[in-house]
Amino acid sequence: MAFKVLCVDHVGVAVKDLALIKQHMKDILGLDPSLPDETVEDQHVTTSFFKPSPQTEACELEFLGSTTPDGPIARFIEKSNGGKNGFQHVALRVDDIEACLADLQAKEVPLIDKKWRVGAGGCHIAFLHPKATGLLLELTERPGGPSFNK
């Protein structure tokens, strides 16, 4: 393969009340967001990332709150999770997202994104269709990777 999966980057959790879950993370676990909240307008979502220790490369938790009652996250919570907060996706960090997508397309793996797009934190991201694995998987290349130099 022309790419490597480096680690689990983050786990995405869809939540009905982003402010409430942020307060729970602070009060119960003593965690503050590792990045400022970011709204992705075209996806109707606000994201809030938490990691156990800002000094490590530990896997983060991404909480996703819908900015509209009919946004993708709100629909996911209602349809897929019975109206409750829950697991939405796993993000895998890759060393070269363009090589990864080319390899997956050559293997005819179903993709939501055939080309990367900019996600939260300026990362280059793309999603595999759940038909590929039974899960929603996100591929993430962090700033500084090969696709940022093209």
Regions found by a protein language model. Name each.
Residues 2-4, 15-23, 38, 48-51, 59-61, 68-73, 77-131, ...:
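Vicinal oxygen chelate
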Residues 2-6, 20-23, 27-28, 32-35, ...:
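Intrinsic disorder/low-complexity detector
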Residues 45, 56-58, 82-87:
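Short connector loops at helix/strand junctions that flank enzyme active sites
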